[in-house]
Regions:
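P-loop NTPase catalytic phosphate-binding loop
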Residues: 11, 46-52, 140-149, 167-299, ...
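Short, charged, solvent-exposed linker or helix-capping segments at domain edges/interfaces
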Residues: 158-162, 202-203, 446-450
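Low-complexity, intrinsically disordered P/S/T-rich segments
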Residues: 1-198, 226
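Short hinge/gating elements
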Residues: 56-70, 107-113, 197-203, 247-255, ...
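Conserved alpha/beta core segments of nucleic-acid transaction machinery
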Residues: 323-325, 426-523, 527-545
């Protein structure tokens, strides 16, 4: 009996070890969606920042039987399409059928001598003959075939959660990943805004354009903390982007006034120029190299000086130059989103076009990117100047072929299905890619926004939306209200015993250049010391002085 008891104990302990081992394997194998998304930020110094959980987004709803019914419908349509093509005297063979979440692609290999244009122009007639909502026909690049896209009988809803939780998004190396949706084969489509480097979006009412912009913003907010990504949101319609008010990523409140929108774009141009000057001082060409060098300089304690003119020699008349230590700080990416360009072009067309042109031509290397959207992709809104500087463009459903050609240079956007169905032309690629955008509920956006607000308050810069003439009056920070502002800065520095450009910028909500001039004046008046070898300054006077 004793040996039987021992054997029982041995078998039980062995079984217990196997259970523990299996549990450990299970823990390793299955990570929470939140952990998988956080994996992208493990190398970043954001220990205090809590990234949004994937649980804030809704799970995809799967309806049983839809795939099977769509498959049967595709088989029926294959025979029907062959008969319809024959009726229109188009010779060829349907060589492949690929079913996607929204449409099914029928690959047609036309007979020798058949012109592609003769098939493409029959798109509307083929749709009518097959009782389809619409049909899109295009050439397949690199192959002797045409793609005929016919909507499925039952349309599958694409959810943002399944895109963000996909392997494609979690393992991407993109710096600014945008989740666009799924292609016609059901594969997630992730693009990098940093490579575009700017994006032009068009689509009529009900096309899914605004929902698509929300999906793009959320995909950025899920992986980028406020110290690495700043947003300027311009929403003249006052409806679409106001939900993001007061998230810590914002540089200024959501801009709804057209004149303030002009000021915000002009401020962005000045910020771009300021960044280029700083990069020139460090001898680098782009923001990633600048940030890497700044981190190395701070770690090593090395100081970089710049020469500034402080006056003229009374005898020779030559300028007197002095060396000043640079305040070294890394630059976050800045993304400017304009939700309705048409409204701004009506009120301030020339100023808006000039600012957008300047930014789209030069801002990429400074880490500044644009997402510009409009409901009216006409030539008076999307001018040749604007379009030529946006090589990457997205078109949701538009009214007619003219609008389609205006935005993507080709016809086809007028045949889209709406509700997130889009065509994208990428920089450096000739072919159009059809994507089905994800559906994002207002409640999902609000849940993510509420979470972000708990992570901290935004540090708004009033100078972003300040009027141009007011900016000129107070740019020196030395006259009228400028003296009062300077006195406030001195009081804060003496009270807190801290002095830096960024410290003044945060507390007074002013721009970098203006804060830098205030610090320089404090140094010249003996209130703060020159920057030491690590760029820090000592406050030389007390609060009682």
């Amino acid at each position: 009996n004793f040996f039987i008891f021992l054997s029982y104990i041995f078998r039980f302990s062995k079984k217990l070890q196997l259970i523990k081992l299996e549990n450990k394997k299970t823990v390793r194998r299955f990570k929470t969606p939140k952990e998988r998304l956080k994996k992208r930020s493990l190398t970043k110094n954001n220990s205090d920042y809590d990234f949004p959980s994937i649980e804030l987004l809704e799970l995809p709803e799967k309806i049983e039987g839809i795939d099977l019914e769509n498959k049967k419908n595709a088989e029926t349509n294959t025979n029907l399409l062959a008969n319809v093509l024959s009726d229109f005297k188009i010779s060829g063979e349907i060589t492949d059928v690929k079913q996607g979440p929204i449409v099914t692609l029928f690959e047609l290999t036309p007979a020798p001598g058949t012109l592609s244009s003769s098939v493409i122009r029959l798109a509307e007639d083929i749709a009518r003959s097959m009782s389809a909502i619409s049909t899109r026909i295009s050439t397949i690049v690199g192959r002797d075939a045409l793609g005929i896209e016919i909507p499925n009988k039952h349309r599958e809803t694409v959810y943002l959660r399944e895109i963000l939780d996909s392997k494609f998004f979690r393992e991407t190396n993109d710096k600014l990943p945008l989740a666009l949706g799924k292609d016609i084969f059901g594969k997630p489509v992730i693009v990098d805004l940093a490579k575009m480097p700017h994006l032009l979006v068009a689509g009529t009412t009900g096309s899914g354009k605004s929902v698509g912009i929300n999906a793009m913003l959320l995909s950025l907010l899920y992986v980028l903390p406020p110290d690495e990504c700043k947003l300027i949101l311009i929403d003249p319609k006052m409806l679409e982007l106001s939900v993001y008010q007061d998230i810590p990523h914002l540089l200024t409140e959501v801009v709804t006034d057209p004149q303030k929108a002009v000021s915000a774009l002009k401020w962005t141009v000045k910020e771009m120029e300021s960044r280029y000057k700083m990069m020139q001082h460090l001898g680098v060409r782009e923001i990633e190299a600048f940030n890497d060098k700044v981190k190395k300089l701070i770690d090593s304690g090395e100081v970089i000086f710049k020469e500034i003119q402080v006056g003229y020699d009374p005898e020779t008349g030559k300028p007197i130059m002095e060396k000043k230590a640079l305040d070294l700080e890394t630059f976050p990416k800045i993304i400017v989103v304009v939700d309705e360009l048409a409204d701004l072009m009506i009120t301030s067309g020339r100023e808006i076009e000039g600012a957008i042109q300047r930014l789209s031509q030069m801002a990429r290397a400074a880490g500044i990117h644009l997402i510009v959207a409009t409901q009216r992709p006409s030539v008076d809104v999307i001018t040749g100047t604007i379009k030529s500087n946006f090589p990457t463009r997205i078109s949701y459903k538009v009214v007619n072929k003219i609008n389609s050609r205006t935005i993507i240079e080709k016809e086809g956007a007028e045949q889209l299905l709406g509700q997130g169905d889009l065509l994208i032309t990428m920089f450096g690629e000739e072919r159009l890619i059809r994507v089905h955008g994800p559906f994002v509920k207002t409640e999902e956006v609000q849940s993510v926004v509420d979470h972000l607000k708990k992570q901290g308050e935004p540090e708004y810069l009033n100078s972003v939306t300040i009027e141009e003439e007011d900016s000129q009056n107070i740019s020196l920070g030395l006259n009228e209200g400028g003296d009062e502002l300077y006195n406030q800065a001195v009081a804060i520095v003496c009270r807190e015993k801290k002095a830096s450009t960024s410290f003044i910028q945060r507390h007074l909500q002013i721009g970098y250049n203006r804060a830098a001039r205030i610090i320089e004046r404090m140094e010249s008046e003996g209130i703060v010391s020159p920057a030491n070898h690590v760029g820090r300054r000592e406050v030389l006077v007390g609060k009682d002085n």
